[in-house]
Swiss-Prot record:
Recorded consequence of changing S174D: Stimulates premature CPE-dependent polyadenylation and translation in primary oocytes. Does not diminishes the interaction with cpsf and papd4/gld2
Phosphoserine: modified positions: S138, S174, S210, S248
Record organism: Xenopus laevis (African clawed frog)
GO molecular function: metal ion binding; mRNA 3'-UTR AU-rich region binding; mRNA 3'-UTR binding; mRNA regulatory element binding translation repressor activity; ribosome binding; translation factor activity, RNA binding
Post-translational modification: Ser-174 phosphorylation by aurka in immature oocytes is essential to trigger CPE-containing mRNA cytoplasmic polyadenylation and translation activation and the subsequent signaling events that result in meiotic progression. Ser-174 phosphorylation recruits the cleavage and polyadenylation specificity factor (cpsf1) into an active cytoplasmic polyadenylation complex. Ser-174 phosphorylation increases its affinity for cpsf1 and papd4/gld2. Heavily phosphorylated by CDK1 on serines late during oocyte maturation. Ser-210 phosphorylation is sufficient to target cpeb1 for degradation.
Positions with biased composition (Low complexity): 179-195
Protein name: Cytoplasmic polyadenylation element-binding protein 1-A
RRM domain boundaries: 313-410, 432-513
Ranges where the record places region Disordered: 173-195
Pfam families named among the record's database cross-references: CEBP1_N (PF16368), CEBP_ZZ (PF16366), RRM_7 (PF16367)
Region Necessary for degradation by the proteasome, residue ranges: 181-208
Length: 568
């Protein structure tokens, strides 16, 4: 029985029974063990041609046997070369090749007796390596049946015998190879091989196995290791090209975490920081405060001409006396109608109480029960007309125990300012929509659309996000009619807006929707990578999988704001 490969002329080769430089399996010394295993498996293994040729000098005599590790022994068990389907539970060719790929160690393309020398030649079977690699295109996206046990990774005994730099800085994690998402019967705990007896496991562990077939050699000027560039994460050709241009052969071990050859699983299983992605996503929402603007818009905001405006029942009160209390506010404004008070820090445990012992931050929100109360309040205010912008500011005089006749600013919100449609017949495409954060309170939807259209062009819609009282929450959405304008806006990221009344830096991100992970297509994808190398949705495990690579580790996640807009 043999593993058929094809030589350069397309003819089948037997890498276990023919004289070659390829390391061979020491089957002759294991014949009795194989017969006992075959008997336990109802003689399902084909031993034709096996153990008929002794390991004579000049063929495979120089190979050293490796019998200290159980994992490689199991992953290189004999299997039938016939075209009949394998017995239930036995590993097939794909499974065995998975084990080969996981062992991408220096010198596996040469006999072990010549690992430390430069004389070892590379294998002459590149087509076999390519075919094996093609079967491993995406272990996460294309479930493959895995019918063998999860054995321990190569241990310290191998590191002591062969202390190569890669071994010293690496650790093979079998879970990354064996974590298939297939629902195949051969994956289940009741499959034939997975539920084998302890005696069978003992037989397997006692096998004397030589090194595996050459696979993905790291030497010889190879520019990159396909395994380490994210097998299973479905990096497309653009990603692979970027990785090939960034990772050099000499620095191939430096581009990965020193604790694991297969990326991400240490990070995934980290008990110290299970919510690191969420924390980074929350920090990104305040990124405008610490990042420089890439472009600036300056000018006049569009004039506002209202006919019978309808207001939100919620108004902003700025510049309130520092010693004001909730009782004092209600007593002052209840002449206009029933109301409640919302203090800053509404996300805390007591949103309707002044923070830190009646020490407000200088502003507060009033929520009236009727829109008519807001109209009455505005009529009682003095107005400062801002002729250059067509805006007017409302001020109301109030007093506290220690401050007499203090003017506070009243900022209402007209409901018509929440949405602006430039082309009513244009269909709004979420994939061409951006999220704009850190908006100034004086920016309405029309002004936002005008600014974004001046900068990037193609704006067909702008909307301001509001809470349950239909009052702005400081963010908005802008939809474009073409992909180029959309990508320009996303690439800009931070834009500074300068007007006669205020200067504000806003933050632009892709608009996020509920989506499945675009890598595994199996789990929800709440995390989005805005970097154009990725630019897709990820589940937690796929995010760690892809972004554990050094060239992608600087990417920051985005998440939809989980805080309900009805929280107030």
């Amino acid at each position: 029985m043999a593993f058929p490969l094809k030589d350069d002329l397309g003819r089948a080769k037997d890498c276990w029974g023919c004289p070659s430089d390829t390391p061979a399996l020491s089957t002759c010394s294991n014949a009795d063990i194989f017969r006992r295993i075959n008997a336990m498996l109802d003689n399902s293994l084909d031993f034709t041609g096996v153990c008929t040729t002794p390991n004579t000098k000049g063929k495979c005599e120089h190979l050293q046997d490796y019998q200290d590790t159980e994992g490689p022994a199991a992953s290189r068990m004999l299997f039938s070369t016939s075209h009949e389907p394998l017995p239930r539970g036995l590993p097939d060719t794909n499974d065995l090749c998975l084990g080969l790929q996981s062992l991408s160690l220096t010198g596996w393309d040469r006999p072990w007796s010549t690992q430390d020398s430069e004389a070892g030649g590379h294998s002459s079977t590149p087509t076999a390596a390519q075919s094996v690699f093609s079967m491993l295109n995406s272990p996460m996206g294309k479930p493959s049946p895995l019918g063998f046990l999860t054995f321990d990774p190569i241990g310290s005994d191998l590191m002591e015998k062969y202390p190569t730099p890669l071994l010293r800085s690496s650790r093979l994690d079998s879970r990354s190879i064996l974590d298939s998402r297939s629902s195949s019967p051969s994956d289940s705990d009741t499959s034939g091989f997975s539920s084998g007896s302890d005696h069978l496991s003992d037989l397997i562990s006692s096998l004397r196995i030589s090194p595996p077939l050459p696979f993905l050699p790291l030497g010889g000027g190879v520019s990159r290791d396909p395994l380490k560039l994210g097998i299973g994460s479905r990096l497309d050709q653009d990603h692979a090209a970027l990785a090939a241009a960034t990772v050099s052969p000499l620095g191939i071990t430096k581009g990965w975490p020193s604790t694991s050859v297969w990326p991400s699983w240490d990070l995934l299983d980290s008990a110290e920081d299970p919510f690191s992605i969420e924390r980074e996503a929350r920090l990104h929402r305040q990124a405008a405060a610490v990042n420089e603007a890439t472009c600036t818009w300056s000018g006049q905001l569009p004039p506002r001409n209202y006919k019978n405006p309808v207001y939100s029942c919620k108004v902003f009160l700025g510049g309130v006396p520092w010693d004001i209390t909730e009782t004092g506010l209600i007593n002052t404004f209840r002449v206009f109608g029933a109301l409640s008070v919302e203090w800053p820090g509404k996300d805390g445990k007591h949103p309707r109480c002044p923070p830190k012992g009646n020490m407000p931050k200088g502003y507060v929100y009033l929520v009236f029960e009727s829109e008519k109360s807001v109209r009455a309040l505005l009529q009682a205010c003095s107005q400062d007309l801002l002729s250059q912008d067509g805006l007017s500011e409302h001020y109301f005089k109030m007093s506290s125990r220690r401050m007499r006749c203090k003017e506070v600013q009243v900022i209402p919100w007209v409901l018509a300012d929440s949405n602006f449609v430039r082309s009513p017949s244009q269909r709004l495409d979420p994939s061409k929509t951006v999220f704009v954060g850190a908006l100034h309170g004086m920016l309405n939807a029309e002004a936002l659309a005008s600014i974004m259209n001046d900068l990037f062009g193609g704006v067909v819609y702008a909307g301001i996000d509001t809470d349950k009282h239909k009052y702005p929450i400081g963010s908005g959405r802008v939809t474009f009619n073409n992909q180029r304008s959309y990508l320009k806006a996303v690439s800009a990221a931070f834009v500074e807006i300068k007007t006669a009344k205020f200067t504000k830096k806003v933050q632009i991100d892709p608009y996020l929707e509920d989506s499945v992970c675009q890598v595994c297509n199996a789990q929800p994808g709440p995390f989005f990578c805005r970097d154009q190398v990725c630019f897709k949705y990820f589940c937690r495990s796929c995010w760690h999988w892809q972004h554990s690579m050094e060239i992608l580790r600087h990417h920051r996640p985005l998440m939809r704001n989980q805080k309900s807009r009805d929280s107030s």
